Design a protein with these regions (language model features):
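Residues that define the transmembrane beta-barrel architecture of outer-membrane proteins
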Residues: 28-32, 65-67, 104-108, 147-155, ...
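Transmembrane beta-strands of outer-membrane beta-barrel proteins
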Residues: 48-50, 83-85, 121-127, 153, ...
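Outer-membrane beta-barrel transmembrane domain signature
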Residues: 127-212, 221
Length: 250
């Protein structure tokens, strides 16, 4: 129970920082984030990870900002702890009408994910390390042959609370409180060690034990590489989560 209150206070603190203490030099956007997440267990110890995402740029449905395809190989320490090694390809679409070429990114990643469950609630956390290789721009119309590189670490915590007396059961809604902070590091990082914070408040509908639909409000607060410029994104996030167990007898 104490962990629950610590989490709630942490979310409130991060929300206050991102919403009420925004610097003056902040741009704003409204977006839609769509995603599909899959975790497939192949055996007692091994499984696969896959997620695919698409995000609009502004005014909810105007143009695209980001496309993500990410895969990974997962090792199950036990039913509640998982280690994943993976690769992601990210396509950053032109950020404005003056840029005519997309910026590709190659992103190897490593992750430890763990779950804390009881009869009524569910807590998920992960720490992810990413190695980000992004194509440099020569101009608004041309990419360079070289890449910029930096590390990024992400900490994600999600708390799921049932809205039905029976608890977290199929064909019922539950509430979600989720926060993820991103921190940059590496030789090429000068001004923005803090990268971004994502606060999500939403609902989960469980079709069954393995298929869930999540939807709700996402606030993303980003510090750009310049260090003194920020971006605040208000988004509708919709995600389909599928967990498959291919072990015999499961």
């Amino acid at each position: 129970m104490k962990l629950k209150y610590v989490f709630v206070w942490m979310v409130l603190l991060l929300s206050s920082i991102s919403v009420y203490a925004q610097p003056k030099n902040t741009s704003h956007a409204s977006q839609v984030w769509l995603a599909y997440f899959n975790q497939t267990r192949l055996s007692n110890k091994w499984g696969l990870w896959g997620d695919f995402q698409l995000r609009t740029r502004e005014e909810l449905v105007s143009d695209l900002s980001t496309g993500i395809a990410r895969v990974g190989l997962t090792y199950f320490v036990d039913d509640n702890v998982r280690l994943t090694l993976g690769y992601g390809f990210i396509n950053n679409y032109p950020a404005n009408d003056n840029i005519t070429v997309s910026q590709p990114e190659h992103r190897p990643w490593q992750q430890v994910q763990w779950f804390t469950k009881n009869k009524r609630t569910r807590l998920m956390q992960y720490i992810r390390l990413e190695e980000r290789y992004r194509k440099r721009y020569l101009s608004n119309t041309e990419l360079a042959d070289s890449y910029s590189f930096n590390f990024r670490v992400r900490y994600n915590i999600l708390y799921q609370i049932p809205l039905h007396p029976a608890g977290l059961v199929a064909r019922k809604l539950s509430a979600l409180i989720n926060d993820e902070i991103h921190v940059n590091f590496g030789k090429q990082i000068v001004n923005n060690y803090f990268d971004q914070n994502r606060l999500f408040l939403g609902l989960n509908y469980a079709f069954d034990a393995n298929n869930n639909l999540q939807f709700g409000y996402l606030n993303t607060f980003i510090q750009t590489a310049a260090g003194n410029q920020y971006r605040n994104i208000n988004a509708l996030r919709v995600a389909y989560l599928q967990n498959l167990d291919l072990r015999k007898g499961k």
